[in-house]
From Swiss-Prot:
Protein name stated in the entry: Peroxynitrite isomerase
Annotated domain remarks: Forms a 10-stranded antiparallel beta-barrel structure able to accommodate a hydrophobic ligand in its interior. In fact, this fold hosts the heme group, which is located in a wide surface cleft.
Pathway(s) served: Nitrogen metabolism
Organism, scientific name: Streptomyces griseus subsp. griseus (strain JCM 4626 / CBS 651.72 / NBRC 13350 / KCC S-0626 / ISP 5235)
Similarity section: Belongs to the nitrobindin family.
GO molecular function ontology, one term from the record: peroxynitrite isomerase activity
Metal-binding is among the record's keywords: yes
Region Disordered: start-end pairs: 1-21
Assembly mode: Homodimer.
Lineage, opening ranks: Bacteria, Bacillati, Actinomycetota, Actinomycetes, Kitasatosporales
């Protein structure tokens, strides 16, 4: 049965000044709040060719000491037009008093990552502690991610991957721009 959209009693905030106020432990990452869109490129030795993609990433919070994280990507053709969905993941970044970030990230392809890292000087570096795979998921052994605010409205992303018997190596990079509030999906 379909229910019409309704206002949540405690909606997430996408901006530092919105209510609820960010938890004090989120101070190193409040600049990430919002929706980011842009393009990037990727490749991996097991793929037929390198590729271009568009990406949308959203960070929000509900006043507790973690960020909600959602990312979607679409493969692009040579003219920059979307071909098909290529990746999707969701999760949480848990901020700790010592500046550590514990990230829980899941993908509908059957991959769940637990990563640990640090938030410093506008950058968040994460490396996997554990990867759990559904029985039919492709083998992934490790990932390393770096998110960097190069200015208040630009977020860069680099993703290294160890999968299907290959060592940890470059997989993805993107440059995203902050979306103005009220734009987008």
């Amino acid at each position: 049965m379909h229910h019409p959209a309704r206002e949540l009693p405690f909606p997430d905030a996408l901006r530092p000044g919105a209510r609820p106020a960010p938890h004090p432990l989120l101070a190193p990452v409040t600049g990430y709040l919002g929706t980011w869109r842009g393009t990037g490129s990727g490749g991996y030795p097991t793929l037929d060719a390198d590729f271009s993609y568009a990406q949308e990433v959203t960070f929000s919070h509900d006043g507790r000491p973690f960020l909600a994280y959602e990312a979607r990507a679409w493969l692009l053709d040579a003219d920059g037009q979307p071909l098909r969905p290529s990746a999707r993941e969701t999760g949480w970044w848990r901020l700790q008093p010592d500046g550590r970030v514990e990230a829980l990230i899941t993908q509908p392809t059957g991959i769940a990552e637990i990563s640990v890292g640090h938030a410093r000087d506008g950058a968040v570096d994460l490396a996997t502690e554990r990867v759990a795979l559904a029985p039919t998921a492709k083998e992934v052994d490790a990932t390393r991610r770096r998110y960097t605010l190069t200015d208040p409205d630009t977020l860069t992303f680099v993703h290294d991957l160890a999968a299907v018997g290959r060592p940890l190596q470059h997989h993805l990079s993107a440059r995203l721009r902050r979306e103005a509030p009220g734009q987008g999906i």
